[in-house]
């Protein structure tokens, strides 16, 4: 018979494994000397983007990551680590934790999983500095309409010069 405590741990591993397997983004970060008030502030900021921040025991994290076929991430789970799990958003949690880590030196991003691929700290920094989807769409729209705008300006200038040459018309 399985002891109740062991049963809870097995359930925790299974739940975390499922979350990791279905998440779009998982970020591992150190929080060792972060005050509770700052951790709660981070939690509130991430909740706006439908993310979950949770501290799990190291063994549960390691087993869940291994069961989720992300074995390379186990090496980053030494010491006091927390997970940000985002089932829907891809870049927003990365940007949020990156900006939070710049303000709070106690938070150190370690690694993560983006679309089931393990990413390094450098890749996370690159993703965090990308423009948002709305900004990218605005840039695309501006670049698509720029030639038309230049054509309209050129034609307008041509009409203006013709009017100056022939003021009778």
Swiss-Prot record:
Chain segments annotated as transmembrane: none
Native source species: Onion yellows phytoplasma (strain OY-M)
Keywords: Ribonucleoprotein, Ribosomal protein, RNA-binding, rRNA-binding
GO molecular function: large ribosomal subunit rRNA binding
Biological process terms in GO annotation: translation
Xref: InterPro entries: Ribosomal_uL10 (IPR001790), Ribosomal_uL10-like_sf (IPR043141), Ribosomal_uL10_bac (IPR022973), Ribosomal_uL10_bac_type (IPR047865)
Subunit structure: Part of the ribosomal stalk of the 50S ribosomal subunit. The N-terminus interacts with L11 and the large rRNA to form the base of the stalk. The C-terminus forms an elongated spine to which L12 dimers bind in a sequential fashion forming a multimeric L10(L12)X complex.
Domain of life: Bacteria
Cross-referenced Pfam families: Ribosomal_L10 (PF00466)
Entry keyword annotation includes Transmembrane: no
Membership in a protein family: Belongs to the universal ribosomal protein uL10 family.
Record's GO cellular component terms: ribonucleoprotein complex; ribosome
UniProt xrefs under PANTHER family: 39S RIBOSOMAL PROTEIN L10, MITOCHONDRIAL
Family matches, as Gene3D superfamilies: 3.30.70.1730
This protein's name: Large ribosomal subunit protein uL10
Function recorded in the entry: Forms part of the ribosomal stalk, playing a central role in the interaction of the ribosome with GTP-bound translation factors.
HAMAP family, sorted: Ribosomal_uL10
């Amino acid at each position: 018979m399985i002891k109740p405590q062991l049963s809870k741990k097995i359930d925790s591993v299974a739940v975390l494994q499922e979350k990791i397997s279905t998440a779009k983004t998982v970020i591992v970060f150190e929080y060792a000397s972060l005050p509770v008030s700052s951790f709660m502030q981070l939690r509130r900021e991430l909740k706006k983007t439908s993310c979950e921040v949770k501290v799990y025991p190291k063994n549960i994290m390691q087993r869940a990551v291994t069961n989720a076929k992300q074995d390379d991430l186990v090496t980053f789970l030494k010491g006091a680590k927390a997970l940000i799990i985002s089932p829907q958003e891809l870049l927003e949690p990365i940007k949020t934790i990156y900006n939070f880590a710049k303000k709070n030196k106690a938070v150190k991003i370690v690694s993560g999983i983006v679309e089931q691929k393990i990413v390094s700290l450098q890749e996370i920094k690159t993703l965090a500095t990308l423009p948002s989807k709305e900004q990218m769409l605005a840039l695309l729209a501006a670049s698509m309409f720029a030639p038309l705008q230049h054509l309209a300006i050129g034609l307008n200038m041509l009409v203006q010069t013709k009017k100056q040459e022939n003021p009778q018309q």
